Amino acid sequence: MLQPKRTKYRKQFKGRIKGVAKGGSDLAFGEFGLKAQEPNRVNAREIEAARRAITRYMKRAGRVWIRVFPDVPVTAKPTEVRMGKGKGSVEYWACKVKPGRMMFEIDGVSEEIAREALRLGSAKLSVKTRFVQRIAE
């Protein structure tokens, strides 16, 4: 699973996801892509599950690019522990995804295979997504 090798700080504030993606919203590598339609926190497990679903359907033909990286530590206190006594330990890593953010890109396969592979991948994610295709010039 994806996570940073090292960070400046161990824990982070929760924060809010406001506005739309100002960068990483266009196809940069592949011919087809999966674009987020709503804001949410996508954890590393979801990204990995989506990547597996996409590559499995493509039967390892073509290429997959993951355009998001889980860099936000999400903390949780153990069950049945009273409030207070400090912030909980880091449970998992997540990525704050804004609407318009390109999450996955694929290339080297037909449109039908790409569409179905990305549909299977999007089922693993906690954000609404849509299929996008590069416009031929």
From Swiss-Prot:
Q: Some GO term, biological process aspect, for this entry: which one?
A: translation
Q: Could you state a single Gene Ontology molecular function term?
A: tRNA binding
Keyword rRNA-binding listed: yes
Q: Which InterPro entries does the UniProt record give? A: Ribosomal_uL16 (IPR047873), Ribosomal_uL16_bact-type (IPR000114), Ribosomal_uL16_CS (IPR020798), Ribosomal_uL16_dom (IPR016180), Ribosomal_uL16_sf (IPR036920)
The cross-references to Pfam families, in alphabetical order and at most eight, read: Ribosomal_L16
Q: Which UniProt keywords apply?
A: Ribonucleoprotein, Ribosomal protein, RNA-binding, rRNA-binding, tRNA-binding
Mention any one GO cellular component term assigned to this protein in its UniProt record: cytosolic large ribosomal subunit
The similarity annotation says: Belongs to the universal ribosomal protein uL16 family.
Q: Subunit info?
A: Part of the 50S ribosomal subunit.
Q: What does this protein do?
A: Binds 23S rRNA and is also seen to make contacts with the A and possibly P site tRNAs.
What PANTHER family does the database record attribute to this sequence?
50S/60S RIBOSOMAL PROTEIN L16, LARGE RIBOSOMAL SUBUNIT PROTEIN UL16M
Q: What is this protein called?
A: Large ribosomal subunit protein uL16
Species for this entry:
Rhizobium etli (strain ATCC 51251 / DSM 11541 / JCM 21823 / NBRC 15573 / CFN 42)
